[in-house]
């Protein structure tokens, strides 16, 4: 077609960060179709269905185009209403429409009032992992410097913060050690707590290619997933047994002296103490599983996996099935221990790969959108509170204003009933979004912004690869950073960036240890290959080749014993009753489905959350639908599907659709160190309807 132009960019969905190209009708300013970039280093000519078909949201009639202010907010704040009255237009019974200048003026007036009344720390900022690095950087800078509040956080809190904590504790860097294509140089692979084919399918393609050719894959999960079909070792675990299994792998490596003595001597510390503790840990011997009915086969399978891992060039992949537990950070440390013991790190075909969830959650953490890290993981001048702590502060009346960018805390966070009570105490909720998500509906002021397919910016994927995106279509909506700059100026700040490039140049100066050599010009020149941080004269595809990024350059062992609890404790004491639930994604949707549900091709595949139940448990499920209930709340009625892919007395459900209210079930149980919610296991009551 005459008006078609092919434009390259990066996929807006998961942390894999696939290279995409789009046929764009320039005359109509419309994406015709999206396909894998033919030379894409990440996508390698393939995209998942979200990448291919999940672009209808860009032109959806449901997009937020004009800023809105809630009428009840203006009734409570008459001086603000008087100031912006000239711009207000009736939208519906709940909202006025206004312009961006007045929306940010109203927000700034209220922010000043809140801080004058309750103090500088009464304001918090949450979000950023769905937007560009430039916007994330400015979000934390505006909050910390202009508002002088230390309270910044992002959705890594509910996903991979334990990976960051665990890896930085042991090897000094909380990111993937290798590029994806190193999978092809790998001799053995362990996947644990990751439904990779559904959540990260383009990485799964590589894993499956190698597994089919070499029969060298071990898969650990609490239910049977697609990867198990291609695995040499098909390990089904009881719920909450990650740390138990990982310590057992380490036990076998130590007991059979399969560790790499030279590597341990030259590049690590603390191994002798670690060795003594693990050999004396009653839970570390794989024979423990001989007494766990239904899982006895693990007692023989775990030693076989440990031997192959130790004696071959090996990689470990993990997802939220590891991190969203009480001991998520400790389990990540246990994963790194395996690599340190065997020297399976710092070289091609051997390493560690946390499979990040959001398209820019790696970049947002790199930008310092965390309460305990400034940009480049430097120590901030003041440590703020993590999101669960901020919710408590809201309930106590000490935090009174929330700034939110693209993080639906009313859908993806735990204990939604508690969060709803907390935000009712706020005097200002200011949200930047694409759609009227659950949190946007609760907002006092909501501003529509550009999507990733409408702007220029840097995104960093799960393998530390920087991709300079470019807009596929043009939009007159503001970028997130432009809204923040307006707020900053009205709050007395001095931000005067002309474009995202100027912000990125500042990032390169502030976070020079990672990005000094990653100019826009260079990123544009290497758009197809991408550059992996740290980027100086050259980039760094493989981390830790000579030293770990700890203070002394040595990897460190930090042993943590498994704590008997949950399903394992119930089975061992023969008191197993009721049902244990775990949650996860499906291929057709992405997290809260705000974008994917706008695509009929995607939503028609999975238009409701479905509860998977073992066939043998059918007698307990007599209704057409069931409600799940815990002490914290209950779901709405859920459709059932009986299958042999989940274990007896275990259930699985996705959480994509807000109307399901899945996260009502979860309370405050969380990772001990980093407060990531324990989404992956909870005991539920079944109510037939």
Question: Where do the language-model regions lie?
Answer:
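N-terminal export/assembly segments and adjacent metallocofactor-ligating motifs
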Residues: 1-258, 267-270, 274-280, 298, ...
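Phosphate/diphosphate-binding loops
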Residues: 9, 16-19, 418, 425-437, ...
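Acidic/polar loop patches that form or flank catalytic/metal-binding clefts of enzymes
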Residues: 32, 259-262, 315-316, 344-354, ...
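N-terminal leader/propeptide and maturation segments of large enzyme subunits in energy/redox metabolism
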Residues: 80-96, 258-297, 472-541, 604-605, ...
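Extended redox/cofactor-interaction regions of prokaryotic respiratory oxidoreductases
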Residues: 137-208, 213-220, 244-247, 336-445, ...
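Flexible glycine/proline-enriched surface loops and loop-helix/loop-strand junctions
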Residues: 230-231, 282-286, 318-322, 465-473
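Active-site phosphate/pyrophosphate-binding segments
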Residues: 249, 267-386, 533-536
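Long, contiguous, secondary-structure-rich segments that constitute the structural scaffold
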Residues: 476-526, 598-611, 617-689
